Design a protein with these regions (language model features):
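A short, solvent-exposed beta-strand micro-motif common in secreted/extracellular proteins
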Residues: 119-129
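Bacterial N-terminal signal peptides
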Residues: 17-27
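Short amphipathic, basic-aromatic surface patches that mediate peripheral association
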Residues: 44-55
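Short acidic/polar inter-strand loop motif in beta-rich domains
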Residues: 129-136
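Short coil-to-beta strand junction motifs in C2/discoidin
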Residues: 56-65
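Glycine-rich, aromatic-bearing surface loops/beta-hairpins
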Residues: 137-171
């Protein structure tokens, strides 16, 4: 018995394999975090002129960390150095996103921040020179809103960095 080769059969199998592969890739679901919708929130960060004074009272820049959190318990109980660590393992289960920025004394920085729709809190950590005397941690609870309210929201997140304190509010 002889094998008869059908012209184009190899090409046909290759096309079929590509088609199967594409259909399988198309059915793969992304992890929930990767698919989560983002909510844009107008944000304004203002730094006082006397921000983060040194021993001589001269103002200096400060690094601000902004955490999007699903829960706030671990964040509230963590020390400064645990939160400032880029891995922040102590809050890993609650942390949806971490943003780091440096602000200069007297700077006002408007931005449109994108927040994970599962975020319930924004945690702030300011790296002041004098961590012992500073109010380096701030927390703001995000409003729980439905889809339409998110779309038409006019809320604004205000973050204020005073000489040795960080505070936040939603207006």
């Amino acid at each position: 018995m002889q094998c008869v080769r059908v012209p184009g059969s190899r090409r046909h199998r290759a096309r079929l394999a590509v088609l199967v592969l594409v259909s399988l890739v198309g059915s793969v679901q992304l992890p929930h975090a990767a698919m989560a919708d983002k909510v844009k929130v107008k944000t304004e960060i203002s730094a006082a002129a006397d921000l983060n004074p040194d021993r001589n009272g001269r103002a200096s820049p400060v690094v601000l960390l902004m955490f999007q959190l699903s829960s706030v318990d671990a964040f509230q109980n963590a020390d400064f150095f645990s939160l400032f660590d880029p891995a922040a393992a102590i809050i890993a289960a609650d942390m949806l996103e971490r943003t780091e920025m440096t602000l200069q004394p007297g700077e006002i920085r408007p931005l449109e921040a994108e927040f994970d729709e599962e975020a319930r809190y924004i945690g702030l950590v300011a790296a002041f020179r004098d961590v012992e005397k500073a109010q380096w941690r701030g927390i703001v609870e995000l409003p729980d809103k439905g889809f339409l309210k998110k779309v038409f929201s006019r809320d604004k997140l205000l973050i204020q960095l005073q000489a040795l304190a960080v505070t936040a509010s939603i207006e």
